[in-house]
A protein has these predicted regions:
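Peptidyl-prolyl cis-trans isomerase
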Residues: 28-31, 35-36, 87
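M16 family metallopeptidases and their MPP-like homologs
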Residues: 1-24, 55-82, 104-110, 159-170, ...
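Conserved, carboxylate-rich catalytic/transport cores that coordinate ions
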Residues: 96
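An aromatic/glycine/proline-enriched structural segment found at the starts
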Residues: 27-28, 69, 102, 106-170, ...
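Extracytoplasmic/secreted cell-surface and envelope-processing proteins
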Residues: 115-119, 174, 232-234
Length: 286
């Protein structure tokens, strides 16, 4: 998914629609080999910068390890250097024609405009852009595992870091909401189970985090801990497992659960306050 947005006064709406329709309908006319090589270099530098940061190579290894070969999530979005080097002008043109048509886009307008005026203006600027080929929505592929898989990486980092990851259902499911809430309860504050046990009581980790990585055909549930220097990572992992076992067996602390539910409700209300956030939320759920 690529997001484009413009925040303009009403009298500049036509200009914004014209610019976006020009991008969708006529960009290929100015993409030549020189521009492709220039942008390829930009992306490659972005990849190097990311990988040269502490723990920057971890997610590539996680993607390859968590999903089987052939799964769309078994490689990172930015791709490998070999993939970037191999991308041709024809590849770029074919990809653009396939995915950047109006049949694969959602356009939302929010603000001082009525529905009929919006329809007229959008038709004026976008109606002549040809649709791309019909697209088949990918089927969900959670890549369930029947065994534990372990990987050890060595890199120039300030301290050891433990990633525990589970392949779980995709976004916009009941399970996704549960995992999102669970991550907040597990690490949401100094009284949360993982933080309290690892950082405060045992003092074997300097930080601990958890999050649900929501994607279209599969999700991932992460728990991450940074190990205190000199502490055996196995001790930290064992403590993480104990907390998770108790959490699964007994469920969340009712007070923590109530507090996190209230925080999530507030966040959801804040998400629809501004026009941009309204547009984003609308497009996301289309």
């Amino acid at each position: 998914r690529t997001n484009y947005f413009q925040n303009v006064p009403t009298n500049a709406l036509d200009l914004a629609l014209w610019m976006e329709s020009d991008r969708m309908g006529h960009l290929l006319g100015v993409v030549d080999q020189e521009k492709l090589d220039e942008q390829r270099g930009v992306v490659q530098n972005e990849k190097r910068q990311g990988e040269n940061q502490p723990y920057g190579k971890a997610f590539t290894a996680i993607s390859e390890s968590a999903f089987p070969k052939g799964h769309p999530y078994s490689w990172t979005t930015i791709g490998s250097m070999d993939d970037l080097d191999a991308a041709s002008l024809e590849d770029v043109q074919d990809w653009f024609k396939t995915y950047y048509g109006p049949n694969n886009a959602v356009l939302a307008l929010a603000g001082d405009i009525d529905l009929e005026t919006a329809k007229i203006k959008v038709a004026k600027y976008f109606a002549d852009i040809p649709s791309g080929p019909p697209l088949v929505k990918p089927e969900k592929w959670i890549a369930k595992r029947s065994e534990e898989k372990r990987e050890i990486m060595f890199d120039d980092v300030p301290q050891a870091r433990i990633y525990k990851i589970w392949n779980v259902p995709e976004r916009d499911t009941e399970e996704a909401a549960h995992f999102d809430l669970a991550s907040s309860v597990l690490v949401g504050g100094k009284n949360s189970p993982l933080y309290k046990e690892l950082v405060y009581e045992q003092q074997i980790a300097t930080s601990v985090s958890s999050f649900y990585y929501d994607r279209e055909i599969a999700g991932m549930f992460f728990i991450v801990a940074d190990v205190v220097a000199g502490v055996n990572p196995a001790k930290v992992e064992a403590a993480m497992d104990d907390v998770m076992t108790n959490f699964i067996k007994r469920g969340p602390n009712p007070k923590l659960l109530k507090a996190e539910n209230e925080i999530n409700k507030t966040f959801e209300v804040e998400e629809i306050i501004t026009s941009i956030k309204k547009n984003y939320s609308f497009c996301w759920y289309q």
